[in-house]
Amino acid sequence: PKEKREAKLSYDPVGWHNYKFYYGDGSKEAWLMNRGHLVGYQFSGLTDEGRNLVPMTAWLNTGAFTGTDDKNQSSMLYYENGLDSWLANHPNYYLDYKVTAVYKDNELIPRQIILQYVGIDQDGNLLEIKLGSSKEKIDKYSVTHVALDNVSANAEINYADGTAKNT
């Protein structure tokens, strides 16, 4: 997308609750949850779109309790930035990218986010993409699979109803 995305999201995904919890040594507070994009704005252009938003911990979404840490391999941001760089470095190639929220039974909050990605060259050949994460597993078709847990070290999450307790 050429336009900057909206600064604030207003859509509340199913199961949405938010809590300001203490973290670290207990002297700082941060919001536990984000309205997390399954497919990042830089790839989809979707911002406040319900079909693309789920409750994600800030840790899963941005890699940090506050701010961002795109070096955190347990975060969506690590893979989104890595894939965005891969596309920038391969302007004549395509990215096939699938993101799946994984729920157990009738839970409202996803327990995991599964990423699958592969490059495609001008001739339609599949190209392995390895971003350097220990979480990446590549299958026989060159598709990379990553499973990310929707957790936070400072919280116990009730995935069935979206509530949480500070730990």
PLM region spans:
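Domain-level detector of nuclease and nuclease-like folds
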Residues: 1-167
